[in-house]
Swiss-Prot record:
Compartments, record wording: Nucleus; Chromosome, Centromere; Chromosome, Centromere, Kinetochore; Nucleus matrix
GO biological process annotation, one example: chromosome organization
Entry keywords, A to Z: Cell cycle, Cell division, Centromere, Chromosome, DNA-binding, Kinetochore, Mitosis, Nucleus, Tumor suppressor
Assembly information from the UniProt record: Heterodimer with CENPT; this dimer coassembles with CENPS-CENPX heterodimers at centromeres to form the tetrameric CENP-T-W-S-X complex, which is a subcomplex of the large constitutive centromere-associated network (CCAN, also known as the interphase centromere complex or ICEN). Interacts with NPM1.
SUPFAM superfamilies the record matches: Histone-fold
Gene Ontology molecular function terms on file: DNA binding; protein heterodimerization activity
Organismal lineage: Eukaryota, Metazoa, Chordata, Craniata, Vertebrata
InterPro entries in UniProt: CENP-W (IPR028847), CENP-W/WIP1 (IPR052484), Histone-fold (IPR009072)
Keyword Cell cycle part of the UniProt annotation: yes
Classification via CDD domains: HFD_CENP-W
Function: Component of the CENPA-NAC (nucleosome-associated) complex, a complex that plays a central role in assembly of kinetochore proteins, mitotic progression and chromosome segregation. The CENPA-NAC complex recruits the CENPA-CAD (nucleosome distal) complex and may be involved in incorporation of newly synthesized CENPA into centromeres. Part of a nucleosome-associated complex that binds specifically to histone H3-containing nucleosomes at the centromere, as opposed to nucleosomes containing CENPA.
Official protein name in the record: Centromere protein W
Gene Ontology CC terms, in alphabetical order: chromosome, centromeric region; inner kinetochore; kinetochore; nuclear matrix; nucleolus; nucleoplasm; nucleus
Source species of the chain: Mus musculus
Family: Belongs to the CENP-W/WIP1 family.
Length: 86
């Protein structure tokens, strides 16, 4: 068998822990946060962005557009935020 032409890459970039901790302490100094809460917040942001990209891609395909436009992202954001509220 011939080797695959696509090479999978491992993501080596780490979460911006110092930035997240500093921002959280500036915005919400009264919160007592655990050790790994910054990693959980970073993961939550990444999952949100992934859902936003998938939903906006779906919106673009439904409108028969090859390019994801601002309107697609805004509509997807409304849907995702509504779903996350419960």
């Amino acid at each position: 068998m011939a080797p695959s032409t696509t090479v999978t890459r491992r993501v080596k970039r780490k979460a911006p822990r110092a930035f997240l901790k500093r921002t959280l302490k500036q915005k919400k100094p009264h919160l007592g946060l655990g050790r790994c809460c910054d990693l959980l917040i970073h993961l939550n942001c990444l999952l949100f962005i992934q859902r936003l990209a998938e939903e906006s891609r779906t919106n673009a395909c439904e409108s028969k557009s090859r390019v994801i436009k601002k309107d697609h992202v805004l509509a997807a954001g409304k849907v995702i935020l509504k779903k996350s509220r419960g």
